[in-house]
């Protein structure tokens, strides 16, 4: 089976490696052009580009797939299928029609739930019990195509967006190999999505990560896990921005105000919420490093009665 692979970040690189190691014939890799990144804003290759070069797979980095020249190059290869994983470019209808079996997408949710840009974060923030990978036949809609294969797993209580990403990336690689094997054997049965059950995973906005202490502790804990590693759930303490990276829910009824510090010692910084409380275990001051509660308190002693608050001063 002759394959074109299109993807850009680590999530896609995991899938590319799984396909390559399974012995499938990858004719070409498409990935985004090198982009400026880091403090020096130097051009950096995508994880998919780096991997393709390691395996000596032919590589193209077009700015767009709308170009007739690019489309002609793809047609000339006569691919059986194109795999798309977090590529970042729109696939015109002309490109979708090029492979014999069309284009198939690796999507990090259980479609039709969480179509769109941020399925991992939305599943966490909404408190979903499970998530997974859907392999989808691409059409012109936004994640609306028929599902070819779906695999689910439970979201663990301490999962973050980072840990879920890694689990889903590994599962995505396994699922695309399974899909290609079934496709080669003509054993796939497409299942149309139920549009009435669909919901949209909008792109994450930094403003969403500001903690509202009047919410219950379960929701705030989900926020902290959802926005780890990006952009980091944040609050204000003594007028300074603080990011919270890890916390535990404390089930306790208390008359303290939301955001009020109940206790602060080496075991954690316990803060009252709209319902119950949170023990903050890892936090970060603006311009500083991530610190345990004990490390933070050694340099910034806190007393019961002090408050974390909402802020409009911006982000870390």
Curated annotation (Swiss-Prot):
Binding site for (6S)-5,6,7,8-tetrahydrofolate: 109-112
Catalytic reaction equation(s): L-methionyl-tRNA(fMet) + (6R)-10-formyltetrahydrofolate = N-formyl-L-methionyl-tRNA(fMet) + (6S)-5,6,7,8-tetrahydrofolate + H(+)
EC number per UniProt: 2.1.2.9
GO cellular component annotations of the record: cytosol
Stored Pfam families: Formyl_trans_C (PF02911), Formyl_trans_N (PF00551)
Molecular functions (GO terms): methionyl-tRNA formyltransferase activity
UniProt keyword annotations, A-Z: Protein biosynthesis, Transferase
Family as reported in the entry's similarity comment: Belongs to the Fmt family.
Described function: Attaches a formyl group to the free amino group of methionyl-tRNA(fMet). The formyl group appears to play a dual role in the initiator identity of N-formylmethionyl-tRNA by promoting its recognition by IF2 and preventing the misappropriation of this tRNA by the elongation apparatus.
PANTHER family hit by this protein: METHIONYL-TRNA FORMYLTRANSFERASE, METHIONYL-TRNA FORMYLTRANSFERASE, MITOCHONDRIAL
Protein name: Methionyl-tRNA formyltransferase
Taxonomic lineage from the root: Bacteria, Pseudomonadati, Pseudomonadota, Betaproteobacteria, Nitrosomonadales
């Amino acid at each position: 089976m002759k394959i074109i692979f299109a993807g850009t970040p680590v999530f896609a690189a995991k899938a590319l490696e799984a396909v390559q190691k399974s012995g499938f014939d990858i004719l070409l890799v498409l990935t985004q052009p090198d982009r400026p990144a880091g403090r020096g804003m130097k051009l950096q290759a995508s994880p998919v580009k780096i991997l393709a070069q390691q395996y000596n797979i032919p590589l193209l980095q077009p700015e767009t797939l709308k170009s007739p020249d690019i489309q002609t190059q793809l047609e000339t290869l006569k691919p059986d299928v194109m795999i798309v994983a977090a590529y970042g470019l729109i696939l015109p209808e002309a490109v979708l029609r090029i492979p014999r079996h069309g284009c198939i997408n690796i999507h990090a949710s259980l479609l039709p739930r969480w179509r769109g840009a941020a399925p991992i974060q939305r599943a966490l923030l909404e408190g979903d019990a499970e998530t997974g990978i859907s392999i989808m036949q691409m059409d012109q809609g936004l994640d609306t195509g028929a599902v070819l294969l779906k695999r689910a797993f439970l979201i663990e209580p301490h999962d973050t967006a980072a840990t879920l990403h890694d689990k889903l990336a590994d599962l995505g690689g396994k699922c695309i190999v399974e899909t290609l094997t079934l496709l080669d054997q003509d054993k796939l049965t497409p299942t149309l999505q139920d549009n009435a059950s669909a919901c949209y995973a909008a792109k994450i906005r930094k403003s969403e990560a500001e903690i509202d202490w009047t919410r219950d502790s379960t929701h705030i804990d989900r926020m902290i896990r959802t926005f780890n590693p990006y952009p980091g759930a944040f609050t204000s303490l003594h007028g300074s921005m603080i990011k919270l990276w890890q916390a535990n829910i404390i089930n306790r009824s208390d008359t303290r105000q939301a955001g009020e510090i109940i206790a602060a010692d080496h075991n954690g910084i316990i803060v009252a919420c709209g319902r119950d409380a949170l023990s903050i275990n890892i936090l970060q001051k603006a311009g500083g490093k991530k610190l345990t509660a004990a490390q933070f308190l050694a340099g910034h002693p806190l007393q019961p009665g002090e408050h974390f608050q909402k802020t409009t001063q911006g982000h870390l």
